[in-house]
A protein has these predicted regions:
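Soluble FAD-dependent oxygen oxidases
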Residues: 1-296
Length: 296
């Protein structure tokens, strides 16, 4: 059922020691995640969410219910994997399940400097395919595990997951931990479903989000990122980086409608706020981040 949430499906599959790599938010519906791509905590190991789709059921604009896979309505099957909901309403999705019950994961927090941010992102790029995560830099909000004296200071929040053994995870994570400035390190063995239960500040009623792609992230890009953070007046704002590559890049660029196979980093600018009348101001900031950092 395409209306289920990522968290619901992940918890159900965990009872069978199986997993599907969805995005990074358990509250989001699996339909949107799947049709748009699906970058989360397993994509470098098992591919994007859409790479694990075996078949879909689609209601077309004419009201017809159509089954599509590699052999039946193959053009439609190609288009919905990466083309979003532009080709009909996807009501059911058949996935390949991956044998996975636990990961080594959790949140790391580090004091942010341009050099440290650049080194951390590069270490994630160089890491084994089993390691995925979200690397976000933002002014630290009041939340658990953040010392009060760091509220408002720029921190790197890295929510990471390693799909492998604890010993292998320790080796893979060593370069990330080695960049220094670690404030908190909550990475530990856990059930895969637990990675979606990470805490955070309460949501706000309005949000501006823009995404972009990069192939390199050096000290200059990191410095630009840190400067841009100072330019936002939103109560909550961040720039996030998700490393691609691995299994994502091993699928041919024309095999699905997802066209960013060869990109190395996906960036996201986020501004969350309460006053909807301020949307143009915060949209301008997320646009500025996008145009300042995007490559190609």
């Amino acid at each position: 059922d395409a209306g289920l949430s990522a968290g619901e499906v992940t918890r159900a599959l965990g009872g069978y020691d199986r997993a599907i790599g969805f995005g990074d938010n358990g509250a989001v519906g699996i339909g949107g995640i799947t049709l748009g791509g699906g970058v989360g905590f397993l994509h470098r190991r098992f591919g994007l969410t859409l790479d694990n789709v075996l078949a879909v059921e689609v209601v077309t604009a004419a009201g017809d219910v159509v089954y599509a896979d590699d052999h039946s309505n193959a053009d439609l099957f190609w288009a919905v994997r990466g083309g979003g909901g532009n080709f009909g309403v996807v009501t059911r999705i058949k996935y390949a399940l991956q044998p996975l019950s636990t990961v080594v994961g959790g949140m790391m927090m580090l004091r942010a400097t341009p050099a440290r941010l650049a080194s951390f992102v590069q270490a994630a790029v160089d890491a084994p395919d089993e390691l995925c995560g979200i690397i976000a830099v933002l002014p630290a909000p009041p939340m658990p595990n953040v010392p009060p004296e760091l509220y408002g200071q720029p921190l790197i929040f890295a929510l990471m997951a390693y799909a492998g053994t604890e010993d292998d995870a320790a080796r893979a994570l060593a370069p990330l931990r080695g960049v220094g400035g670690v404030v908190a390190d909550g990475i530990r063995p856990l059930r895969y479903a637990e990675i979606f239960e990470h805490g955070g500040p309460p949501p706000m009623p309005a949000v501006s989000v823009r995404s972009f792609y990069m192939d390199e992230f050096d000290d200059v890009a990191a410095g630009t990122t840190m400067h841009l953070l100072e330019e936002s007046s939103a109560p909550m704002h961040a720039v996030q980086f998700r490393v691609l590559g691995g299994a994502v890049a091993r699928v041919a660029r024309d095999e699905t409608a997802f066209v960013h196979r060869d990109r190395r980093i996906m960036g996201v600018a986020v501004a969350a706020f309460s006053d909807v009348h301020q949307a143009p101001e915060h949209d301008a900031w997320t646009d500025d981040v996008t145009w300042s950092l995007r490559q190609g």
